[in-house]
Amino acid sequence: MMKQARSLLSRSLCDQSKSLFEASTLRGFASWSNSSTPGRGFPGKDAAKPSGRLFAPYSIFKGKAALSVEPVLPSFTEIDSGNLRIDRRGSLMMTFMPAIGERKYDWEKKQKFALSPTEVGSLISMGSKDSSEFFHDPSMKSSNAGQVRKSLSVKPHADGSGYFISLSVNNSILKTNDYFVVPVTKAEFAVMKTAFSFALPHIMGWNRLTGHVNTEALPSRNVSHLKTEPQLELEWDK
């Protein structure tokens, strides 16, 4: 059974000057920690103030390439009387890196693919014999359409033991063709699906509907309860 979902996104190209060589495995879904006992994740009444953010990407390292997945949370803008609306929608950012040696990967040649909530739903609903494929074009509705194309595919192993996750990036501007393939086991894919299900309402901003946000403590124009680094926010940042 083949299940194919096509998504053509129109986003502007922008340059990235900062390498994610050291920090890319640490940046992602951020939350505050206020544990009163070192080494334990349970807050207490005497807990110290948060000392920083916790980052928890899920990474899979294989022989020819590595894959890292991390949620990018939406940003919000205050409109009136403390009300908020989404300014930039969230996504699940998939980062692929080619191998350059045993357990060594070239972070400078990474490529990213931002999954929308609907695309996340397609992966969550996949069965053991299902496939999914997504297409992104940053200039779909302009005269530059087709100059940079990304194709992400998820296909099952013939023996049902897992999936092949591959990303193809064709850049006619730079005249480059990048291709990454990361085989994942059933267990690894199960972790991804479970994590995706947990992250989905957060990248949609729906977690705010059931939580209480003190907007007085947030910036007046562009607010985000949990922020990610700018380098993770755009799929087309290189």
Curated annotation (Swiss-Prot):
Keywords: DNA damage, DNA repair, Mitochondrion, Transit peptide. GO terms for molecular function: DNA binding; mRNA binding; single-stranded DNA binding. The keyword DNA damage applies. Coiled coil: none annotated. Residues 1-29 form a transit peptide. InterPro entries: ssDNA-bd_transcriptional_reg, Whirly. One of its GO terms (biological process) is regulation of DNA-templated transcription. The keyword Metal-binding does not apply. It is found in: Mitochondrion. GO terms for cellular component: DNA repair complex; mitochondrion. Disruption phenotype: No visible phenotype under normal growth conditions. Plants over-expressing WHY2 are small with dark-green distorted leaves, exhibit early senescence and produces shorter siliques with half the amount of seeds found in wild-type plants. This is Single-stranded DNA-binding protein WHY2, mitochondrial.
